[in-house]
């Protein structure tokens, strides 16, 4: 959808309503090329992209733009919910199949919120995908890294040095925002007292990915 906003801004610029020309924005084409190259790298000419969607999908038109770009490049697309993956999916020698179609890449447009995993069947489907040879966008570890508690832990003293050289860790920290947990331990109680006095300078975020669900 952001690509459409860019097109709108370009039109406004042509009509001299905007004085600065917006930068080009080819996210959909870039996405399609990346998926196609990933499947080619796997060496599976018959593999498809599994687009994981919600049962009552609200972003249908957004997804159709991606679907069209992939189809133009010869990439097959299978749209399915977690329940459908559970019912129709299986592992064959470690490869993920949904019905008669082998899956090379799983693109998660669902599965980010607790409501997407309401029962044992949906969680079983997620575990099956994680255990497969398919490329997951994102895999569980990357998805967890998008949650605030994991980000808070990674920002802690001495943690980044376990993954990157200390000098690189110091450079990364320059881009971190200060984060406080609100647990019942001493640190959490101290943080609550501090935040009560400085509430207008902080955002209350739940343990969820993405930029929503915030309290200002």
Functional labels for PLM-detected ranges:
Residues 2-216:
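Domain-scale recognition of functional cores that engage charged ligands
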């Amino acid at each position: 959808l952001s690509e459409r906003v860019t097109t709108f801004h370009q039109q406004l610029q042509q009509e001299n309503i905007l004085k600065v020309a917006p930068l080009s924005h080819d996210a959909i084409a870039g996405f399609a090329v990346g998926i196609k190259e990933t499947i080619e790298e796997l060496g599976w000419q018959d593999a498809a992209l599994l687009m994981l969607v919600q049962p009552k999908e609200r972003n249908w038109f957004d997804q159709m733009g991606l679907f069209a770009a992939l189809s133009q490049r010869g990439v097959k697309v299978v749209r399915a919910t977690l329940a459908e993956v559970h019912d129709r999916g299986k592992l064959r020698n470690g490869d993920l199949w949904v019905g008669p179609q082998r899956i090379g890449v799983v693109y998660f447009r669902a599965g980010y919120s607790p409501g997407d995993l309401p029962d044992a069947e949906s969680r079983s489907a997620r575990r099956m995908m994680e255990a497969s040879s398919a490329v997951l966008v994102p895999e569980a570890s990357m998805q967890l890294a998008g949650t605030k508690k994991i980000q808070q832990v990674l920002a802690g003293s001495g943690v980044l040095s376990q993954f990157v050289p200390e000098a690189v860790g110091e450079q990364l920290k320059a881009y971190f925002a200060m984060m406080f947990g609100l647990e019942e331990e001493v640190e959490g109680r101290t943080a609550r007292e501090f935040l009560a006095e400085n509430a207008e300078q902080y955002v209350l975020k739940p343990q969820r990915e993405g930029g929503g669900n915030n309290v200002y």
